[in-house]
């Protein structure tokens, strides 16, 4: 009897320091073990966004293309199937076109996560982003009678983020609530968007709620509000999206939208293996929406319906809150350390880039000196 071939699957994914990609990886790994297939991860990144966040300044040059050359190795790796989390990759393509990127891998059976592509032999899995945000806005308007609702968006070229922002605008319009450009801040899905939240609140002193495009950015909202003496869930309402592991342990617990990243990762592996086994021979592009659910907690002004929270021993909630603050503080300390330790090598890189132009070289030095607050 001929032994069944053990498939080799590749995974192109970035942003693995954030919650949702980690959930994808967990689901992919578990399904791969269950189905006895090999998995190779090709980890790309978005260095431009990272440098701007870590170094606290605008970066003129992007070196994403250097990091993302690893994606090309998946083409020569003898892979049977490929899972691509397009939204997390730092892709340097003309017009940032996912279909163009998909065609590059058209010879491999492929599943795209968090992106919809219309290319043969590619299936797409993406959550119901619009439905999730619509549920949040509707709840704030109908149950809490709020009208001044701000929004912190995710990366501008990320499909999940685009759909969530569109849903915010569409749902606010549905209720006849005006939205100005100053009511929307551009985030990056990281926890370190404190400055964006500060500016948003400065521009909107009458804000009643902030809807964040994911949970990690909402944590920054908690920090900023605490510094301003605003009590989340009373003075201002905050909501997120993802229902990550820290959401229920926040003080107050974070109202959010639950999407199952682990399930999405498993579904991608099941889909690939099913097609590789010949059980789904179709070559046409197929997209599926993964359902989400609204998780009502206390940060939106509701009283939690989580019975287990009512049974929480006295003092345990406070301990969890302190632990969350400690973790966030340690992350901020790490960011501060990275800013200091990376400044010199990045300075050397930028100066080297303009070495042939004396005026540009001197201008670069002056800009860096201003960043160091020296004259």
PLM-predicted stretches and their roles:
Residues 1-357, 363, 367-372:
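Bacterial carbohydrate/catabolite-sensing allosteric modules
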